[in-house]
Amino acid sequence: MATPINANELELQDKVVHINRVAKVVKGGRRFSFSALVVVGDGNGYVGVGLGKANEVPEAIRKGGDQAKKNLFKVPLVGTTIPHEVLGHFGAGWVLLKPAGEGTGVIAGGTVRAVLEAAGIRNVLTKCQGSRNPHNVLKATVAGLKRLRSADDAARARGKQAGELGGA
């Protein structure tokens, strides 16, 4: 099992991706509550996502940030991009992430962009298909990032040295 990541040791920036207002109809009218999708990252390979729910927006954002800090994980980076192409699925949505050359920038929609920038990825190409719901896109992006493997990890899994693997 991997060692847990201590959020207090990292300088995390948080970004609100989506705020949703939900109405519950009661005898006296409507009761509103809010949910907030929050992404936190240190811009250097660590990122986490969380969903907070509360009766007030600031409280929902705080709860989402706290949950995101509990869900931190490390993304392998190669310079300012990702090591290889990867596909992330969640529900009916999927996100394709492709490494890009220096100077390309983050070619992504708002939800995917927030996660990639929080992780410190500066050059990447993406494509979202299927569900465009922010919850599904966010979780599909995270699923894709969790599937990434560095060249060292791939070589170790095959019992070889990183230089022995083919490719770029």
Swiss-Prot record:
One of its GO terms (cellular component) is small ribosomal subunit. One of its GO terms (biological process) is translation. GO terms for molecular function: rRNA binding; structural constituent of ribosome. Residues 12-75 form the S5 DRBM domain. It holds the Pfam family Ribosomal_S5. PROSITE patterns: RIBOSOMAL_S5, S5_DSRBD. Keywords: Ribonucleoprotein, Ribosomal protein, RNA-binding, rRNA-binding. The keyword Repeat does not apply. Belongs to the universal ribosomal protein uS5 family. The N-terminal domain interacts with the head of the 30S subunit; the C-terminal domain interacts with the body and contacts protein S4. The interaction surface between S4 and S5 is involved in control of translational fidelity. Part of the 30S ribosomal subunit. Contacts proteins S4 and S8. With S4 and S12 plays an important role in translational accuracy. This is Small ribosomal subunit protein uS5. It comes from Anaeromyxobacter sp. (strain Fw109-5). The gene is rpsE.
